[in-house]
Design a protein with these regions (language model features):
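Small-molecule kinase domains that catalyze NTP-dependent phosphoryl transfer to phosphate-bearing small molecules
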Residues: 127-161
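Hydrophobic anchor at the beta1->P-loop junction of P-loop NTPases
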Residues: 13
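Conserved phosphate-donor/acceptor-positioning beta-strand/loop module used by diverse small-molecule
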Residues: 102-124
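ATP-binding Walker
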Residues: 19
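P-loop (Walker A) phosphate-binding loop of NTP-binding proteins
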Residues: 16
Length: 161
């Protein structure tokens, strides 16, 4: 495979809250000199503008509120970018659940145990609310897309790694 062909393949990086998906996406974007799109920044911006905290108890409440309003639009934007552009790394919770294993997208899903995720978030206020946030995301993704976000069999079916 030549260099031009490799640049046509995009990366989709996903993972459970606190898994390190954003960190991995930024590292890969730097190493492979690719544009990095962090979908979480859209939600963080909206949350700040609407008076929700990015961390702690407000985060699960905001996720539950905002997903129904803009979730599908943002998810469809993510799919469009991955399937129609080149040389991208996209960090989004559930993109590969929707597009599956696609020849244009190499998808990675990070699924560390809950204790590991809590350790990673130990310095953040949101650590104590990760269980609640997991439940909210699981419910919202199931309602919006029929995605079983914490089902490891589904994760393995839909992601390359």
């Amino acid at each position: 495979m030549d260099q031009d062909s490799i640049k046509k393949i995009n990366f989709s990086i996903s993972g459970w809250p606190g898994s390190g998906a954003t960190t991995l996406a930024l590292i890969l974007a730097n190493v492979f000199e690719r544009e990095c799109i962090y979908i979480g920044s859209i939600y963080r911006f909206l949350g700040t503008k609407m008076g929700f905290s990015d961390k702690g108890i407000n985060r699960p409440q905001f996720d539950e509120y905002i997903e129904e309003i803009v979730g599908k639009t943002i998810d469809q934007f993510s799919d469009f970018k991955l399937l129609n552009e080149n040389n991208l790394i996209l960090d989004s919770d559930i993109t590969a659940f929707r597009i599956g294993k696609h020849p244009k997208v190499f998808s990675i899903f990070l699924s560390p145990p809950l204790n590991t995720r809590k350790e990673r978030m130990a310095s953040k206020l949101e650590m104590e609310f990760v269980d609640e946030r997991d439940k909210v995301l699981e419910k919202q993704y199931k309602q919006l897309w029929g995605v079983e976000y914490f089902n490891t069999d589904t994760i393995n079916q839909k992601h390359n790694l």
